[in-house]
A protein has these predicted regions:
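Cleavable N-terminal export/targeting peptides
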Residues: 1-38, 313-314
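Short loop/turn motifs that connect adjacent beta-strands in outer-membrane beta-barrel proteins
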Residues: 28, 46-55, 97-107, 121, ...
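Surface-exposed strand-loop-strand hairpins of Gram-negative outer-membrane beta-barrel proteins
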Residues: 28-36, 64-88, 122-127, 168-169
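Transmembrane beta-barrel strands of outer-membrane/channel proteins
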Residues: 34-35, 58-64, 108-114, 152-158, ...
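Residues on the lipid-exposed face of transmembrane beta-strands in outer-membrane beta-barrel proteins
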Residues: 48, 60, 91-95, 136-142, ...
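Residues that define the transmembrane beta-barrel architecture of outer-membrane proteins
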Residues: 54, 83-91, 128-134, 172-178, ...
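Outer membrane beta-barrel transmembrane domains
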Residues: 67-71, 75-77, 210-314
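Outer-membrane pore/translocation modules
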Residues: 107-108, 113-206, 212, 258, ...
Length: 314
């Protein structure tokens, strides 16, 4: 069971919080609780029905994100003097139980990030470092044979980090998100792997700003080739598309008194190389980088993920 969402995806939220004090515009345009790119190689374990009755996996993530571009309609277009840097360390614990639900095995996971945010915007800067928002989920895994596993979950992200609408940098988005999730890992051949995870976010209101971010469709993907028994190389990335408009005070978001015609809907596609190494028979480490393209109403930059996974049974 690989992670299916950590609450790290704050890189836009911290930037947008700046504008509450700088020009009284929308404070959260395009923010999400997804963490695009979290999942890469082997999103799900193969043959889950063959795993021990009480199976655990400890995952430790490191994430680095940096952006120098921000073009967003609620700020009138391109924003000058932008530099957004985010670093996160995210422990996550997975559990797979012997209980059966709808023909699959029931499990769950919980993730708690620790974040450091640095934001420079409109000539001002801020930095914050603390615990971030907590994510947890029940999940069901279906064993479809030795080469295919399917999964479904309901992720919940709670606003447990630090938030101040007058600060540029925050480690919380200050709203709850519910995310139905579907994931898959498939081995088309002995040496190839394809993994996919899709979520759909239902964001609740940030009561500090009376702002509600729109619903978001998102997926992570991975395609890899196993060079040796323990080493794989591949491509990874993510796609995110906001499907409904942002609202503030229950109304269309405005800029300079005029309604924003695109609803401040965010979009991004990212792709890049990845490496996966297995060691001590069942443990693994991976590193993945992705460059963002086709960005709308979000920062545009580069994303780096590193991950260590250690499975164990009790």
């Amino acid at each position: 069971m690989h992670p299916t969402r950590l609450t790290r995806s704050l890189h836009l939220g911290v930037a947008l919080a700046a504008c509450a004090s700088l020009n009284a515009q929308a404070t959260e345009s395009g923010v999400d609780n997804i963490g695009p790119g979290t999942d890469g190689f082997y999103v799900l374990p193969l043959s889950p029905d063959q795993l021990p009755e009480h199976m655990f996996a400890f995952n430790l993530y490191y994430n680095h994100y940096q952006a120098r571009k921000l073009d967003i309609s609620s700020f009138g277009g391109k924003v000058q003097e932008v530099r957004i840097t985010s670093d996160a360390i995210i422990p996550r614990l997975d559990y797979l139980s012997p209980l059966r639900v709808l023909g699959g095995r029931l499990g769950g996971y919980v993730a708690q990030p620790y974040l450091r945010q640095q934001v420079s915007l409109y000539g001002q800067s801020d930095r914050r470092e603390s615990m971030g928002d907590t994510t947890f989920a029940p999940i069901i895994l279906w064993d479809m044979g030795p080469d295919l596993t399917l999964g479904a979950a309901l992720e919940v992200t709670l606003p447990t980090g630090q938030y101040d609408a007058d600060r540029l940098a925050n480690t919380s988005n200050n709203f709850t998100t519910y995310k139905p999730l579907f994931s898959m890992t498939w081995l088309p051949s002995e040496r190839t792997e394809l993994s996919f995870k899709s979520t759909y976010s239902f964001n609740q209101e940030n009561h500090a700003t009376d702002y509600r971010s729109g619903q978001i469709l998102h997926f992570d993907y991975s395609a890899s080739y196993r060079l040796t028994d323990d080493l794989s190389l591949g491509l990874n990335g993510y796609y995110l598309k906001q499907t409904t408009d942002d609202k503030q005070n229950g109304k269309t978001v405005t800029f300079m008194g005029e309604d924003v015609s695109d609803g401040v809907r965010g979009q991004v596609f990212a792709i890049g190389p990845a490496l996966h190494l297995r060691f001590l028979k069942y443990a693994s480490a991976e590193i993945r980088w992705a460059k963002e393209f086709d960005v709308e109403n979000r920062p545009e930059g580069d994303m780096l993920w590193a991950k260590l996974t250690i499975p164990f049974a009790l």
